[in-house]
Amino acid sequence: PFNVGGLDKFGTLN
């Protein structure tokens, strides 16, 4: 996870 509560830069759910 890179962006908490959304999509990270790989497009995976956090």
UniProtKB/Swiss-Prot annotation:
Source organism superkingdom: Eukaryota
Tissues/organs with expression: Expressed in stem, vascular tissues and tobacco mosaic virus infected leaves.
EC number: 3.1.2.-
GO molecular function: hydrolase activity
GO biological process: phenylpropanoid biosynthetic process
Induction, per UniProt: By pathogen infection.
Keyword vocabulary terms for this entry: Hydrolase
Pathway it works in: Aromatic compound metabolism; phenylpropanoid biosynthesis
Organism taxonomic ancestry: Eukaryota, Viridiplantae, Streptophyta, Embryophyta, Tracheophyta
Name of the featured protein: Feruloyl-CoA thioesterase
